[in-house]
Amino acid sequence: MVKIYAPASIGNVSVGFDVLGAAVSPVDGSLLGDCVSVEAADLFSLRNEGRFVSKLPDNPKENIVYQCWELFCQEIGKTVPVAMTLEKNMPIGSGLGSSACSVVAGLMAMNEFCGKPLDDTRLLRLMGELEGRISGSVHYDNVAPCFLGGVQLMLEENGIISQPVPSFDDWLWVMAYPGIKVSTAEARAILPAQYRRQDCISHGRYLAGFIHACHTGQAELAAKLMKDVIAEPYRTKLLPGFAAARQAAEDIGALACGISGSGPTLFSVCNDMASAQRLADWLRDNYLQNDEGFVHICRLDKTGARQLG
């Protein structure tokens, strides 16, 4: 049997709409991500379990893990009968790369089980294709960090899909999921078709500056440049309490705060555990809206998807 864990990820990381992503894991060692296991069988089967299993489609063929199996078999040119189990620990429509977790874990599990017939680049292309079926367009800002780990910059040139960006080891990423759903398609539809020239210039400056600061080890500068002029101004209306949470993060001394992916999860960067804990407590008391919500203090997950056991 092969069992793969794929971690949560922050799409965009505020400053890099559709071109930047970061994988995260809780500092307490708990698994914030999905697991998929594969074992030999006479016929294909898929079983679902985990905290958020009730959110999955009733029809197995609509399940993204079934589609992983189907696409993988097409790619290698043969049908592989297996029993797959999806452990759905990630809320759907959370802004934590939930669909990417299932896609990455599903495809990587099949590839490992079959003796790695596909290299990482081919596997990543399939992951992007499947992610596109869910969100409406192929993009890698969740699947690339989830699969490869760390902070990834999407390039999609010269046969290179993404490359790693140096990160800051002392940064703590406070993740708060309020327990409500925002669909990626809805969050994309709310964005304007065209942007003002000044916003385009600002976006280029922030993103280029952030990448430069990461490569030159300037943590304070990098944090200051984590600004989103593309999506956040429009998406905040989908997120009750976001403005108050952002203000609280600033008051507590967070270095940066933004929307994780399409939301509603919020992320905030702190450089000491005391501030991170204070902010986590505030978010738990004020940003969560129901029992499904949660707050985790995380670090970057530099490993990405991996085999368990």
UniProtKB/Swiss-Prot annotation:
Compartments reported by the entry: Cytoplasm
EC number: 2.7.1.39
InterPro entries to which the protein is assigned, alphabetical: GHMP_kinase_C_dom, GHMP_kinase_C_sf, GHMP_kinase_N_dom, GHMP_knse_ATP-bd_CS, Homoserine_kinase, Ribosomal_Su5_D2-typ_SF, Ribsml_uS5_D2-typ_fold_subgr
Main enzyme class: transferase
Binding annotation for ATP: P91, I92, G93, S94, G95, L96, G97, S98, S99, A100, C101
Primary site of residence: cytoplasm
GO biological process: threonine biosynthetic process
Family membership noted in the UniProt record: Belongs to the GHMP kinase family. Homoserine kinase subfamily.
Keywords from the named record: Amino-acid biosynthesis, ATP-binding, Cytoplasm, Kinase, Nucleotide-binding, Threonine biosynthesis, Transferase
Organism: Pectobacterium atrosepticum (strain SCRI 1043 / ATCC BAA-672) (Erwinia carotovora subsp. atroseptica)
GO cellular component, one term: cytoplasm
Protein name: Homoserine kinase
Function: Catalyzes the ATP-dependent phosphorylation of L-homoserine to L-homoserine phosphate.
Keyword Transferase in record: yes
Signal peptide, first to last residue: none
Superkingdom of origin: Bacteria
Reaction(s) the record says it catalyses: L-homoserine + ATP = O-phospho-L-homoserine + ADP + H(+)
Taxonomic classification: Bacteria, Pseudomonadati, Pseudomonadota, Gammaproteobacteria, Enterobacterales
Pathway assigned in UniProt: Amino-acid biosynthesis; L-threonine biosynthesis; L-threonine from L-aspartate: step 4/5
A single GO molecular function term of this UniProt record: ATP binding
